[in-house]
């Protein structure tokens, strides 16, 4: 460890992992003095009895409203509509059930709630200015998260949002320059006060969704290790999480999924994101910047893009810097003791590609519907402008041309 030491400030809510754990929801809300809650979900999740019925039972009389209207577009308008419903019912908390879009929408809803009667005006201002603050003189609604995917963005106090008041904004047909702009909000008070990772609910998620989200979550563990903001604490959680994920992710392709392996996958996804969104900064990095480059105009999960580009991005990183390759190799269980640095790097690249292949994800950008080589200059510009590129490993600073070359190699 560097003699300068380190700081680590990360304050997640209570975490419950295990089959049937959502039956503790009511008890947890009682412990937190929360009397009433609104269930927030997407339209599919919110109408799937195998998902929502156990949650309804767990919440009991504290469940007073449901808002099954989130979408992948996660617009400001959707969050504002959810807040209006929450106010009508007088709820104390939102229970977000589903994937990253739903969790982000719930956080934006909570951020708006901190502004009281000014929420609609704040939303309109955010569309104009790109700035969505949390009020300093108001408290956001409490958030409880019940993830059903493995993207690993749950233990976080930040959220992305599409800055449009149109709830039905369609981003898939738009390019980044033409569609509504993206924004974000971050505040320690948006960290979920409790999180429930229920294996029974994950069994209801389509295999393709689990697979793509798992690649996204897996890459968070990799990037925590070479982040310039890494600490011995995050090294420990990320490395252990990667081992658990390598043990457990194979369960996703099984029917039925093996209980022990699924348990490993859930424990792993919690571990790899523990400390990801610390007060010191966000510890995801260049691979996620590449994923964000496809976030507008492409109907594709971020994890699918990760699976394709991560091996190529890692090979580039290792060509520029050490990238803590020995630590990453150890975390992945690779026997590379005494091997040359370039051999270690290639073993890591191969291991990450093997995870992708085990998940059944595509290996080339040309195999993703809607992606064209002619889009690469625009995508490369978006990646180069992404905030997460600023927290790439020390010494890694790709030009737009180098980013475009990586995309070409992934084609």
Q: Where are each of the predicted segments found?
A:
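A glycine/threonine-rich phosphate-anchoring loop and its flanking beta-alpha core
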Residues: 5, 114, 118-231, 324-331
């Amino acid at each position: 460890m560097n003699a300068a030491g380190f700081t680590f400030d990360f304050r997640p809510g209570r975490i419950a992992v295990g089959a049937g754990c959502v039956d503790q929801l009511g008890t947890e809300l009682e412990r937190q003095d929360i009397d009433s809650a609104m269930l927030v979900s997407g339209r599919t999740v919110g109408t799937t009895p195998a998902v929502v019925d156990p949650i309804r039972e767990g919440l009991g009389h504290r469940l007073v409203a449901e808002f099954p209207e989130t979408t992948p577009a996660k617009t400001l308008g959707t969050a504002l509509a959810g807040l209006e419903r929450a106010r009508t019912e007088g709820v104390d908390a939102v229970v977000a059930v589903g994937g990253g879009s739903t969790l982000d929408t719930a956080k934006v809803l909570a951020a708006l709630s901190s502004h009281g009667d000014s929420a609609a005006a704040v939303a309109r201002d955010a569309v104009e200015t790109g700035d969505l603050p949390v009020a300093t003189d108001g408290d956001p609604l409490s958030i409880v998260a019940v993830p059903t995917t493995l993207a690993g963005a749950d233990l976080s106090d930040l959220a992305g949002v599409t800055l449009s008041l149109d709830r039905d904004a369609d981003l898939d047909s738009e390019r980044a320059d033409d569609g509504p702009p993206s924004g974000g909000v971050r505040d320690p008070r948006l960290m979920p006060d409790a999180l429930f990772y229920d294996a029974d609910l994950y069994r209801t998620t389509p295999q393709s969704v689990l697979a793509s989200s798992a690649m996204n979550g897996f890459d968070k563990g990799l990037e925590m290790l070479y982040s310039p903001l890494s600490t011995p604490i995050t090294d420990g959680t990320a490395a252990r999480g990667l081992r658990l994920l390598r043990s457990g992710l194979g369960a996703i392709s099984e029917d039925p999924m093996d209980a022990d392996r699924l348990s490993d996958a859930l424990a792993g996804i919690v571990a790899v994101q523990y400390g990801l969104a610390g007060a010191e900064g966000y510890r995801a990095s260049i691979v996620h910047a590449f994923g964000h480059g496809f976030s507008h105009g492409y109907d594709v999960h971020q994890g699918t893009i990760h699976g394709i580009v991560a091996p190529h991005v890692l090979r580039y990183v290792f060509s520029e810097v050490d990238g803590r390759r020995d630590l990453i190799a150890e975390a992945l269980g690779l026997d590379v003791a005494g091997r040359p640095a370039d051999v270690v790097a290639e073993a890591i690249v191969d291991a990450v590609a093997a995870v992708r292949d085990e998940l059944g994800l595509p290996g080339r950008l040309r195999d993703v519907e809607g992606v064209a080589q002619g889009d690469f200059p625009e995508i490369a510009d978006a990646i180069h402008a992404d905030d997460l590129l600023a927290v790439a490993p020390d010494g890694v600073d790709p030009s737009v041309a180098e980013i475009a070359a990586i995309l070409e190699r992934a084609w």
